[in-house]
Amino acid sequence: MSYTSYILAFQLCLILGSYGCYCQDTLTRETEHLKAYLKANTSDVANGGPLFLNILRNWKEESDNKIIQSQIVSFYFKLFDNLKDHEVIKKSMESIKEDIFVKFFNSNLTKMDDFQNLTRISVDDRLVQRKAVSELSNVLNFLSPKSNLKKRKRSQTLFRGRRASKY
């Protein structure tokens, strides 16, 4: 790699690094704006302990953590939807939703739309209840870890095959 390439790579790292700091600074500012608007820094907010943080700390495995994170993200989307008419904090909420979109949904709009559609389904609707029960066995099949067993068996077979060929 030539000297010029090193300089260009270094400049690119600086630009990308400063952009990340800028985004994080903006996100921090918007979060602080929401806290101030909702008076979330007062002492009574601490009563009863944290709402989500202890739960997040208890769930260590990535797949388990994703389940909890999805419930928490769902809560925040409902919260933002509840506060959508408050013009003073609208920009802050949009910035935070954008950050959630990037971090949780990997910037995939279809995933986010599907997620939001799921959170809007009314459990009180009798037709929805009937549809959900009708689909229950299929959903349970999706939830079962069968696909992991197939992958594990396939990799074990490949591993055994390689080991056998060595001897």
UniProtKB/Swiss-Prot annotation:
Classification via InterPro entries: 4_helix_cytokine-like_core, Interferon_gamma
Record key words, sorted: Antiviral defense, Cytokine, Glycoprotein, Growth regulation, Pyrrolidone carboxylic acid, Secreted, Signal
Top-rank taxon, per record: Eukaryota
Single GO MF descriptor: type II interferon receptor binding
GO cellular component assignments: extracellular space
Subcellular location(s) of the protein: Secreted
Residue(s) carrying Pyrrolidone carboxylic acid: Q24
A Gene Ontology BP annotation from the UniProt entry: adaptive immune response
Main subcellular location: secreted
Assembly, per entry: Homodimer. Interacts with IFNGR1 (via extracellular domain); this interaction promotes IFNGR1 dimerization.
Function: Type II interferon produced by immune cells such as T-cells and NK cells that plays crucial roles in antimicrobial, antiviral, and antitumor responses by activating effector immune cells and enhancing antigen presentation. Primarily signals through the JAK-STAT pathway after interaction with its receptor IFNGR1 to affect gene regulation. Upon IFNG binding, IFNGR1 intracellular domain opens out to allow association of downstream signaling components JAK2, JAK1 and STAT1, leading to STAT1 activation, nuclear translocation and transcription of IFNG-regulated genes.
Protein's name in the database: Interferon gamma
Gene giving rise to this polypeptide: IFNG
